[in-house]
């Protein structure tokens, strides 16, 4: 790896993709600083583990930096980026730093449009509890380890690999998981064909001794199989995949299922996390664990004790007979899976959703699909679009989604005021805050109100 004790500065250090890398670098002995627009639990945590944190962006923040790390959300007009250019300080994308961290390890990458964070978390914990002591970089907080990153002494690094801007193609894994491929990030790829081609390239870059572990339930994944030139293992809930979950039982406080590997039953799992989509995510982690020689009993014990990931079907609290759940889902497929999981666990309770659309481009491309994805919701309140750094697009507002919901016979209204919203709630209601922006704050505020 590069020279020790570097002064490394992150612009937007509180971001989910940046904070984990920063923490690993701190644990490697580097001096890490970073800036963000506001103080958050993440920036406070990084401060506690040794990072120098600046609130707000300023050219003064990089005075000691030897390299500046940015994400795609950071503009080239950012004052810290401008100052770094003037001072001839190298400016690199977060993926370049991640590649550097992974260079001297055997990388396990978790890719796919949906389910990456949970699958990365499950896989990381399977390797951790299986005695492999991996380095871990995840896009969400793994509750069992109380962090989204860990520096391990073992040979492996488990990475949540982001396909949104094609940057996952720079990683060179020995094992890669593909959870699914769906119509997202087409503002970058232009077409589904280009998106599929990127996944094929990522899979085929693994060495001849590596393995791709792919979800055959997903139609697009099945379509790319003829183009795969490396060893692969399939997993899923349908058909005859190499790793299959059968006898799935969704009960009040757990989901149980039997696991078959190469048509033979290897054991059973009884997990605490909600949703059949998480059964699928568990199968991916099982596949990685078995491929690396971890016993099924160890893998199953890890999955059974898995507490989940922050902002993924996370129960925030229950008060006066009403429950508040938060989820990061921001694509129609994710929305539908999340609502279905909640309804399976609490079919008798009214499900009320506070939905915050994420990005103007996604809203423009998928508003019709969003309108069809809320069929399991009893009532939906739609917030304004969370821009995630994008510039507004003419005539693209959350009203597009609202109108699509109404046309699909979903009871939906525009959100205006939380106190007014709380007055319409009843004992037994489940309130879901849904979206990749800051809608989770509404849930915390609501718990204080009711």
Curated annotation (Swiss-Prot):
Keywords tagged on the record: ATP-binding, Cell cycle, Cell division, Cell shape, Cell wall biogenesis/degradation, Cytoplasm, Ligase, Nucleotide-binding, Peptidoglycan synthesis
Binding annotation for ATP: 112-118
Subcellular localization: Cytoplasm
A GO MF label: UDP-N-acetylmuramate-L-alanine ligase activity
Its EC number(s): 6.3.2.8
Gene3D superfamilies listed in its UniProt record: Mur ligase, C-terminal domain, Mur-like, catalytic domain, NAD(P)-binding Rossmann-like Domain
SUPFAM superfamilies in the record: MurCD N-terminal domain, MurD-like peptide ligases, catalytic domain, MurD-like peptide ligases, peptide-binding domain
Primary localization: cytoplasm
Biological pathway: Cell wall biogenesis; peptidoglycan biosynthesis
Catalytic activity: UDP-N-acetyl-alpha-D-muramate + L-alanine + ATP = UDP-N-acetyl-alpha-D-muramoyl-L-alanine + ADP + phosphate + H(+)
PANTHER family membership: UDP-N-ACETYLMURAMATE--L-ALANINE LIGASE, UDP-N-ACETYLMURAMATE--L-ALANINE LIGASE-RELATED
Name of the protein described by the UniProt record: UDP-N-acetylmuramate--L-alanine ligase
Organism of this sequence: Endomicrobium trichonymphae
Phylogenetic placement of the source organism: Bacteria, Pseudomonadati, Elusimicrobiota, Endomicrobiia, Endomicrobiales
């Amino acid at each position: 790896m590069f020279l020790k004790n570097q002064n490394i500065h992150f612009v937007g250090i509180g971001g989910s993709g940046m904070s984990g890398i920063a923490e690993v670098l701190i644990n490697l002995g580097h001096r890490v600083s970073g800036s963000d627009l506001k103080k958050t639990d993440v920036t406070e945590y990084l401060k506690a583990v040794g990072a120098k944190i600046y609130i707000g962006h300023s050219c003064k923040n990089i005075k000691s930096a030897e390299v500046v790390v940015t994400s795609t959300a950071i503009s080239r007009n950012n004052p810290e980026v401008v100052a770094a250019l003037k001072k001839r300080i190298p400016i690199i994308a977060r993926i370049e730093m991640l590649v550097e961290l992974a260079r001297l390890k055997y990388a396990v990458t978790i890719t796919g449009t949906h389910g990456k964070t949970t699958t990365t978390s499950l896989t990381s914990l399977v390797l951790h509890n299986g005695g492999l002591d991996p380095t871990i970089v995840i896009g969400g907080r793994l509750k069992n380890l109380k962090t989204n990153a860990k520096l391990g002494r073992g040979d492996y690094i488990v990475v949540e690999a982001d396909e949104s801007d094609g940057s996952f193609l720079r990683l060179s894994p020995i094992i890669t998981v593909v959870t699914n491929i769906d119509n997202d990030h087409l503002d970058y790829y232009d077409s589904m064909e280009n998106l599929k081609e990127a996944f094929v390239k990522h899979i085929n870059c693994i060495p001849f001794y590596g393995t791709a572990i792919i979800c055959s339930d997903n139609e697009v994944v099945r379509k790319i199989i003829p183009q795969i030139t490396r060893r692969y293992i399939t997993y899923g809930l349908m058909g005859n995949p190499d790793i299959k979950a059968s006898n799935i039982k969704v009960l009040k406080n757990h989901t149980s299922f039997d696991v078959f590997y190469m048509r033979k039953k290897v054991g059973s799992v009884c997990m605490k996390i909600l949703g059949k989509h998480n059964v699928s995510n568990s199968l991916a982690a099982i596949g990685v664990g078995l491929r690396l020689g971890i016993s099924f009993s160890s893998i199953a014990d890890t999955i059974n004790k898995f507490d989940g990931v922050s902002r993924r079907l996370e129960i925030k609290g229950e008060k006066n007979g009403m429950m508040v759940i938060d989820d990061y889902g921001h694509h129609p497929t994710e929305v539908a899976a999340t609502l279905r999981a909640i309804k399976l666990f609490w079919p008798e309770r009214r499900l009320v959703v506070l939905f915050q659309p994420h990005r103007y481009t996604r809203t423009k491309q998928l508003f019709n699909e969003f309108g069809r994805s809320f069929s399991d919701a009893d009532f939906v309140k739609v917030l304004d679009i969370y821009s995630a750094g994008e510039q507004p697009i003419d005539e693209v507002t959350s009203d597009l989604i609202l109108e699509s919901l109404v046309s699909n016979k979903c009871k939906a209204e525009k959100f205006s005021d939380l106190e007014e919203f709380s007055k319409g709630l009843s004992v037994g209601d489940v309130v879901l805050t849904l979206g990749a922006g800051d809608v989770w704050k509404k849930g915390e505020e609501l718990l204080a109100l009711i």
